[in-house]
């Protein structure tokens, strides 16, 4: 999965997908009542990027729905996964469940079109704080009470705080999650970060009793760091330059071993050689 980083304006969906992304990451900010409000990152953000592009969250979802609904004039067949980077740092811990409920209702109405031929992309809810694990239960509860529990088949999870792998496993246990787990590791492109924790996550993914299904690394903009991440065995790379990742995947060393994921590749299944 080539994951286009910080796609917060509808126009950027086309831009990043046309550069080679089959997945995008979008920032979601919340108001003081835990309603998802804007797709917005703000400053500081990655080096070389504009940090202030934004849409109202529900409007972004409508644009995203068009981009992922077969037959729509804006449809991109290869856009198959969306990571919502949930900026829950502005919320109190006891608002996490409410944030999940409100997020689910927004997605149901504006992205899934109330279950009637909505957008088809898989969705990852990426939560920065382990203490906010109740967001997951709130999300599930809202979809269930609205009569669409089947949409949970399209939803996965990530805790993005670079926490100890054991602590993350524990948070999932508390959240009642057994599957659909992506594990992120990374840092802004302005700084360097080693691959030690990525290797631990990959080892967990490949063990018989691990909780992780997929591992992605962020934010990678250079060819050499792309190669290093692929050598470590990641499933996804988040980038500001999808074309750079696509170029490296075309190199002979990687062409035989990796391919770009399509809609038929289940993002919740651990890949077995």
Curated annotation (Swiss-Prot):
Its main location: secreted. InterPro entries: PLC-like_Pdiesterase_TIM-brl. Expressed by the venom gland. One of its GO terms (biological process) is killing of cells of another organism. Glycans are attached at residue 250. GO terms for cellular component: extracellular region. Disulfide bonds join 45-51, 47-190. This is Dermonecrotic toxin LarSicTox-alphaIB1aiii. Binds 1 Mg(2+) ion per subunit. Belongs to the arthropod phospholipase D family. Class II subfamily. Its cofactor is Mg(2+). Its EC number is 4.6.1.-. It comes from the Eukaryota. GO terms for molecular function: lyase activity; metal ion binding; phosphoric diester hydrolase activity; toxin activity. Mg(2+) binds at residues 25, 27, 85. It is found in: Secreted. It comes from Loxosceles arizonica. It catalyses: an N-(acyl)-sphingosylphosphocholine = an N-(acyl)-sphingosyl-1,3-cyclic phosphate + choline; an N-(acyl)-sphingosylphosphoethanolamine = an N-(acyl)-sphingosyl-1,3-cyclic phosphate + ethanolamine; a 1-acyl-sn-glycero-3-phosphocholine = a 1-acyl-sn-glycero-2,3-cyclic phosphate + choline; a 1-acyl-sn-glycero-3-phosphoethanolamine = a 1-acyl-sn-glycero-2,3-cyclic phosphate + ethanolamine. Pfam families: GDPD_2. The active site is at 5, 41 (nucleophile). Dermonecrotic toxins cleave the phosphodiester linkage between the phosphate and headgroup of certain phospholipids (sphingolipid and lysolipid substrates), forming an alcohol (often choline) and a cyclic phosphate. This toxin acts on sphingomyelin (SM). It may also act on ceramide phosphoethanolamine (CPE), lysophosphatidylcholine (LPC) and lysophosphatidylethanolamine (LPE), but not on lysophosphatidylserine (LPS), and lysophosphatidylglycerol (LPG). It acts by transphosphatidylation, releasing exclusively cyclic phosphate products as second products. Keywords: Cytolysis, Dermonecrotic toxin, Disulfide bond, Glycoprotein, Hemolysis, Lipid degradation, Lipid metabolism, Lyase, Magnesium, Metal-binding, Secreted, Toxin. SUPFAM superfamilies: PLC-like phosphodiesterases.
